Curated annotation (Swiss-Prot):
Belongs to the chaperonin (HSP60) family. It comes from Burkholderia thailandensis (strain ATCC 700388 / DSM 13276 / CCUG 48851 / CIP 106301 / E264). It comes from the Bacteria. Forms a cylinder of 14 subunits composed of two heptameric rings stacked back-to-back. Interacts with the co-chaperonin GroES. NCBIfam families: GroEL (TIGR02348), PRK00013.1 (NF000592), PRK12849.1 (NF009487), PRK12850.1 (NF009488), PRK12851.1 (NF009489). It catalyses: ATP + H2O + a folded polypeptide = ADP + phosphate + an unfolded polypeptide. This is Chaperonin GroEL 2. One of its GO terms (cellular component) is cytoplasm. ATP binds at residues 30-33, 51, 87-91, 415, 479-481, 495. Pfam families: Cpn60_TCP1 (PF00118).
Amino acid sequence: MAAKEIIFHDGARTKLVEGVNLLANAVKVTLGPKGRNVVLERSFGSPVVTKDGVSVAKEIELADKVQNIGAQLVKEVASKTSDAAGDGTTTATVLAQAIVREGQKYVAAGLNPLDLKRGIDKAVAAAVEELKKISKPTTTSKEIAQVATISANGEESIGQRIAEAIDRVGKEGVITVEDGKSLADELDVVEGLQFDRGYLSPYFINNPDRQLAVLDEPFILLHDKKISNIRDLLPVLEQVAKAGRPLLIVAEDVEGEALATLVVNNIRGTLKTVAVKAPGFGDRRKALLEDIAILTGGQVIAEETGLTLEKATLQELGRAKRIEVGKENTTLIDGAGDKPNIDARVKQIRAQIADATSDYDREKLQERVAKLAGGVAVIKVGGATEVEVKEKKDRVDDALHATRAAVEEGIVPGGGVALIRVKQAIAELTGANVDQKAGINIVLRALEEPLRQIVANAGEEASVVVATVAAGSGNYGYNAATGEYGDLVESGVLDPTKVTRTALQNAASIAGLLLTTDATVHEAPKDAPPAQPAGVPGAGGTGFDF
């Protein structure tokens, strides 16, 4: 085990605070509509230019071990806020730095750190309750666009794209972000259920212009095993042929004789069919097949349900208005499933989401809900260079998360004003002793910091703006983008309540832990290896090393 070094008391805290300040100073230059960019070096590929606070924080590793501990603790604030709310990482970092800075003064003056922390916690709890009171729900597409625009650092086109996507697929719908292939941003909306499996043979294509196999009013056969013997399929094929409608086969795999026969019949025009592999793997595959069955009003042909291919009838087959099968995706449009059954399935999956322990499982379950309840929208981010697309994509992701947070818990006036407005509720608090009251005062001062930083980044005098905003009430605040005072909600400067709340709670949590720290234990620096000799005596000054 490597030797450890221990630092105590003020020496430890001072180094930790230095680390906090180094990271926070790099992150906070990005805050607000006039925030600056940060360039991140990459060990390979182009440098990354970003205004995303958490992206900057994640890149920072300091050479000094103790400073690095402080920096990593604040990095945790940014990461946790990003995970919970998807945005507000820079605000959280600025708040954490302010609480640590103010708290350090009181600790150095001899106040009890534990009582300071109790005062901080009391003030934050009161601030959160007040935020909930001043929050109002998002009801219009315009408000959603405004929230997204603010989170995307004032880029209106991103806000409009996200609002349009939510309009099209609903609040439950899946919205994904991809690299575009043009200079402009694009929005693609897939209505109906889409899964990531394409045709098993290009001979199924009947729309060469779009390279798709398109089936109108088809039957849908769902099977959880491989199909290789055509004799298993013949009874179903004969019934479908008599009905005079096309057939989509979704199975674990279709191969050999069975696939060859389907292709030949398709080419001859005897029976229009398309075969695709079932999406997913293992238990997830079974669940997805069941989703498709419920959406199309069919049943999965599986041994577990006592159904076999040989005895399958048209009653067990699903139906849809139209199906489009590409090389990589299959889209089912307007399935014939009963709405009560679909709603019951959605409710069941939502219950599984509540019980899910891993983020991956939760994400996949939410995707299934969206596919059943709404649809899928894809925002394709355009740009002139790879660096520009990457930077813009980060902002679109932030804006998307902020929008979801706004839908969830509502909105408050942005630009740091909401935190100024909750000060009144905190100012009325009393602590159990002088030290706790000092903790409350720490939060009162820290709540001004996001507004101060937004104003400083805009090149204005922070103290004057803070005093003017504090003298106002309600939504009155400073719009840093225009340099004017007014009603921020009317002018579209909004923040999701969840983002502001999460940023404050996470900042106070980590800052409180830092203030109550009295020792650090870290790996001792290794001694430098002895220098190599410049050459070998008698080698004529050749400088060769051996």
